[in-house]
Amino acid sequence: LEALLKAKLLEKGYDVQNIDMTVGTSYTAVGEALSAGSADIGFISGGNYVLFSDDCDVLLTALRYGINKDSENAADWNDGTLEENTQDMTTYYRSIILAGPSAKGQALLAKVNSGEELTWDDLNSATWSVLAPTSASGYIYPSLWLQEHYGKTIADLDHVVQSDSHSTSLARLATGQADVMVSFGHIRIKNAPNWQEKFGGTAPMVEQTGIIGVTDGIYNDMIAYSKTSDLMACLL
């Protein structure tokens, strides 16, 4: 890899003599190396960028196909149709708070669709399905959304179940074990066909679920540089 990168850089007019490439044990480990200045450049996720943005910044961001709904107003997503992929490329995606078919989930959804603001008590009385604290769409950004709107985080919620995957969260949502779940904004595009047969829904997903919260954009995976690296300080 070092030789390949040197050759590509030379094609661009950069004659770099020494490149040392290592593989981090996780995105977090790479973020920590960038923060400490022991790595000059690293590949990290958007979630880790949030955690280490004081000590690193973005050089390049991956692109992905966008979806046709991007409003930060949750009610705008609830038009009776599922989200669709588009041909437009974007540098980010969003996390959504998805209400399910339980009585509590539907009550929260009805309030959002009527134009009312959800209160902290509304959200705190619901059972949430979340992912591990390192997940951007399944924990970090929904927690930031709660912080921005209510001065609270997921850790402050009274009823939280941690799932091992988005699929597990979907199953809990469909069967009423959870009232709401957090996930990436295009979760329904992929999983709507399996909502009833695989996850246990009793009607089409578009009829049984709806969005009650939308986070800020989450950067796609990126190449970031260290602000604490002596080498990068000389180059930038």
Give the ranges of each region predicted by the language model.
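Short beta-strand->loop
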Residues: 57-90, 103, 159, 193-217
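Short helices/loops that flank or line small-molecule/ion binding pockets
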Residues: 20-42, 50-55, 165-190, 194-195
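Solvent-exposed coil/turn segments that connect beta secondary-structure elements
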Residues: 44-48, 63-65, 100-103, 133, ...
